[in-house]
């Protein structure tokens, strides 16, 4: 009996020696598993839970509450320990993890011993309890125990404006952009305007010649002038210059030129004015017209007495027009376009026309002073060849206009010296024009005493052609002059003055 007891004690001692290393090995393995798989937090939680519970195993397997620890088994028989181990029920705990949506699932225990779901099965992102031991999940291989990177939201950190982030107007370049854009637009607009103006000026029709104010007044007073008459007046009013071969108007008022006549007289040369009454036998009425003009008021005289230098530009303008007029062949449409001259073609025929009839001498009643006045000496007999009497066509022909032969008119040697000196003394009137000639003619017809020179009617037939051309030129003579106050009738002191 004593021998059996000794053998049993030896076995129990050997068995207790074998259990102690196994318990220490299990604890070391559990610590290594928690450090490698769950990290410091999960491992600490596992270790703390295992230490707090004290009755569970470190690998997640529960121990029966009635089974004491290995240290308490010392001194117990081996059969009792084996029976207690077989009767104990173990279960697993599923650790906490982050699922596929980034949500954290807490750990849970598979301790449903009645149904047998004691093991943690499934995948790392979806875990559940099962009762098949070979399907349980090795949780140490899973890595979803920490929050994923894509779930972590960036922290909204407010950056305070430092000295480098402050607004500096000198570094702002937006104003320069606006200025440059506006400048380019303005430059394009100005360039377009200048281009438009230049294009209009380049394609503008040529302007008409600016007529001098004095020339415009003269043309306005003359009215519509035939072309032949205009040529006649222009050619008779200008002289050819030997130096520049340009027409130059004679500026001398008293231009004495000897005239070739059929009968040469040794007396003094007569005055040859520019188609004025000096070539007409009406000097008495000429002097009376100046007598009327002598009574003009001071205001009118000051208006008439103008500076001749003002007409220098008019003189040059007339010379230029005359030069261009005879140099251009197609001048008729140009003159007609200006509306100043009608289109009357110059007749260039060289045929001799039929002899013209001399106009009948007007019959005038002699006044009392004419009858009582002493007889005036008649001039010498005037003889003029018939071929020297020119017609209108010959007078207005191109050869006659360009010729240097002066127009012939009968000499007047018995004119009243008083009338001639009085006419010449009036220097405020420059040159007698056809307007004044017609004005003298009207005065002569109204005053028979002006025709006391018997020779005055003899030269009327020779100058009828010239006076006929000048008579149709002026439609208004005295009416176009300035208003002359005062009475203009020349009294003859005759009570029996009758005009037929």
Curated annotation (Swiss-Prot):
Principal location class: membrane
Endpoints of the signal sequence: 1-25
Residues bearing the modification Phosphothreonine: 433, 477
Post-translational modification Phosphoserine, affected residues: 391, 397, 409
GO CC, alphabetical: AMPA glutamate receptor complex; asymmetric, glutamatergic, excitatory synapse; dendritic spine membrane; postsynaptic density; postsynaptic density membrane; postsynaptic membrane
Protein name: Protein shisa-6
Composition skew (Polar residues), residue ranges: 240-255, 448-464
Topology of the protein relative to the lipid bilayer: Single-pass type I membrane protein
TM regions (residue ranges): 175-195
Gene name linked to the record: SHISA6
Topological domains annotated Extracellular: 26-174
UniProt entry tagged with the keyword Glycoprotein: yes
Quaternary context: Component of the postsynaptic hippocampal AMPA-type glutamate receptor (AMPAR) complex, at least composed of pore forming AMPAR subunits GRIA1, GRIA2 and GRIA3 and AMPAR auxiliary proteins SHISA6 and SHISA7. Interacts (via PDZ-binding motif) with DLG4/PSD-95 (via PDZ domain); the interaction is direct.
Protein localization: Membrane; Postsynaptic density
A biological process from GO: excitatory chemical synaptic transmission
Keywords: Glycoprotein, Membrane, Phosphoprotein, Signal, Synapse, Transmembrane, Transmembrane helix, Wnt signaling pathway
UniProt GO molecular function: ionotropic glutamate receptor binding; PDZ domain binding
InterPro entries tied to this protein: Shisa, Shisa_N
Residues carrying covalently attached carbohydrate according to the record: 32, 59
UniProt function note: Involved in maintenance of high-frequency synaptic transmission at hippocampal CA3-CA1 synapses. Regulates AMPA-type glutamate receptor (AMPAR) immobilization at postsynaptic density keeping the channels in an activated state in the presence of glutamate and preventing synaptic depression. May play a role in self-renewal and differentiation of spermatogonial stem cells by inhibiting canonical Wnt signaling pathway.
Organism: Homo sapiens
Region Disordered: start-end pairs: 52-73, 240-269, 349-378, 444-470
Similarity comment: family membership: Belongs to the shisa family.
Domain comment (free text): The PDZ-binding motif interacts with PDZ-domain of scaffolding protein DLG4.
Tissues where the protein occurs: Expressed in the developing ventral mesencephalon.
């Amino acid at each position: 009996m004593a021998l059996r007891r000794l053998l049993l004690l030896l076995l129990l001692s050997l068995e207790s020696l074998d259990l102690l290393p196994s318990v220490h090995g299990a604890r070391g393995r559990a610590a290594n598993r928690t450090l490698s798989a769950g990290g410091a937090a999960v491992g600490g939680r596992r270790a703390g839970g295992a230490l707090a519970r004290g009755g569970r195993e470190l690998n997640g397997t529960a121990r029966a509450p009635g089974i004491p620890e290995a240290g308490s088994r010392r001194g117990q028989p081996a059969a009792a320990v084996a029976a207690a181990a077989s009767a104990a029920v173990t279960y697993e705990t599923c650790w906490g993890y982050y699922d596929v949506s980034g949500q954290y699932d807490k750990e849970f225990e598979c301790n449903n011993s009645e149904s047998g779901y004691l093991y943690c099965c499934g995948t790392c992102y979806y875990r559940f309890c099962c009762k098949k031991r070979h399907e349980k999940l090795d949780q140490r291989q899973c890595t979803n125990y920490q929050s994923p990177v894509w779930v972590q939201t960036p922290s909204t950190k407010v950056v305070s404006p430092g000295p480098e982030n402050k607004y500096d107007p000198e570094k702002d370049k937006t104003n320069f952009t606006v200025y440059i854009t506006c400048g380019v637009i303005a430059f394009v607009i100005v360039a377009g305007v200048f281009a438009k103006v230049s294009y209009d000026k380049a394609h503008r029709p040529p302007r008409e010649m600016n007529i001098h104010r004095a020339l415009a007044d003269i043309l306005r007073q003359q009215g519509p002038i035939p072309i032949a008459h205009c040529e006649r007046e222009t050619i008779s009013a200008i002289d050819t210059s030997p130096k520049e071969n340009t027409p130059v108007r004679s500026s001398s008022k008293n231009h004495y030129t000897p005239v070739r006549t059929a009968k040469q007289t040794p007396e003094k040369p007569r005055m040859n004015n520019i188609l004025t009454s000096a070539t007409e036998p009406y000097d008495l009425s000429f002097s009376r017209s100046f007598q009327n003009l002598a009574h003009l008021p001071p205001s009118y005289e000051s208006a008439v007495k103008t500076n001749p230098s003002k007409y220098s530009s008019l003189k040059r303008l007339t010379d230029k027009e005359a030069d261009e007029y005879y140099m251009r062949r197609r001048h008729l449409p140009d003159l007609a376009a200006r509306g100043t001259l009608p289109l009357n073609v110059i007749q260039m025929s060289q045929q001799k026309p039929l002899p013209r009839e001399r106009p009948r001498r007007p019959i005038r009643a002699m006044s009392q002073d004419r009858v009582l006045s002493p007889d005036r000496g008649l001039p010498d007999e005037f003889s003029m060849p018939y071929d020297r009497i020119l017609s209108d066509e010959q007078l207005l022909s191109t050869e006659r206009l360009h010729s240097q032969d002066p127009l012939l008119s009968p000499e007047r040697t018995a004119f009243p010296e008083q009338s001639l000196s009085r006419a010449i003394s009036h220097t405020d009137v420059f040159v007698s024009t056809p307007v004044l000639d017609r004005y003298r003619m009207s005065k002569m017809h109204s005053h028979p005493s002006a025709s006391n020179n018997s020779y005055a009617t003899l030269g009327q037939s020779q100058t009828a052609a010239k006076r006929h051309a000048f008579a149709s030129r002026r439609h208004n003579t005295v009416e176009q002059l300035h208003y002359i106050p005062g009475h203009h009738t020349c009294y003859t002191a005759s009570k029996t003055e009758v005009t037929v």
